[in-house]
């Protein structure tokens, strides 16, 4: 998915790095698991400081919480028939990718952080499997966020044309494209010989460092979906601003002699008559739709904001480092890597917090189990 570290072969997060030399790295001065030092030193007992224990504990809790929360969302969607439709299929696709991140990617990344000298000691085959799943799952998670944003955008701006049938077809197509594109980016090095992930001499496991693949993977996995979600939110903002202006123009001044008249209950139009009074034409259906659209727009905004904050430090670093032949301190690389992983924890929190049906389903699920 990226140039050097999405495989998790980042220098250790949970400890101050040992002495490094730029000559240890065969390419851009980055030592990926080839330098000594770290949490566990060869031939020595691991120096488990309080800081090390704290950070490792937090990372283990993050992995467990990411897995359990996304699994809860998946179980709820499977068991509640009302969720067997859009947009919950997009939510389920996101939860699947995030569960796989928690199960297949984050644990081995933590093992790599703790390994002696940050070396990959699990063999070439497992290295390729790990990196392939890393790129596949993280890319799918990112593109699923873009798919949810697109679905909300079309629902808000084209609710008449975006019928249930159209929405079902569009969501199924977006899910298929998401996983197909993610698989292409993940498997391209293996299918087309686009660089090598495993270095047996240095015991190093990392995403292919081929410059052309670096550009292809970072753009396909992050910068393209980033452009999509930013464009979508800009359009949602414009649509909301337009509707707010239209509502203000719908407020009509009434003369002082105007009398109030109650509309039929179906439309629930309310007329108020006072001196210098106004009348607002708004049906209960319009009000309900506007509230729903407002919640959807807020959810999309928070989802996009968290997505950008979690991933942009990592991908900016991975784009700039090869161009300037420079490198951040190892501790920052690890922080940016795990910040990106944490997006898989925040995703289910965000899209369930804005849907009361999920909260009710969670309560019902646990009540039945008792």
Swiss-Prot record:
Annotated membrane topology: Multi-pass membrane protein
Subcellular location: Cell membrane
Low complexity bias spans: 20-36
Stored InterPro entries: 5HT5B_rcpt, 5HT_rcpt, GPCR_Rhodpsn, GPCR_Rhodpsn_7TM
Record region (Disordered): 1-36
Residues in compartment: Cytoplasmic: 76-88, 151-168, 234-300, 353-370
A biological-process GO annotation: adenylate cyclase-inhibiting serotonin receptor signaling pathway
Any one Gene Ontology molecular-function term assigned to this protein's record: G protein-coupled serotonin receptor activity
Tissue specificity as recorded in UniProt: Expressed predominantly in the central nervous system; in the hippocampus, habenula, and the doral raphe.
Regions that span the bilayer: 49-75, 89-115, 128-150, 169-189, 212-233, 301-325, 328-352
S-S pairs: 127-205
PANTHER family named among the record's database cross-references: 5-HYDROXYTRYPTAMINE RECEPTOR 5A, ADRENERGIC RECEPTOR-RELATED G-PROTEIN COUPLED RECEPTOR
Family note: Belongs to the G-protein coupled receptor 1 family.
Protein name, per record: 5-hydroxytryptamine receptor 5B
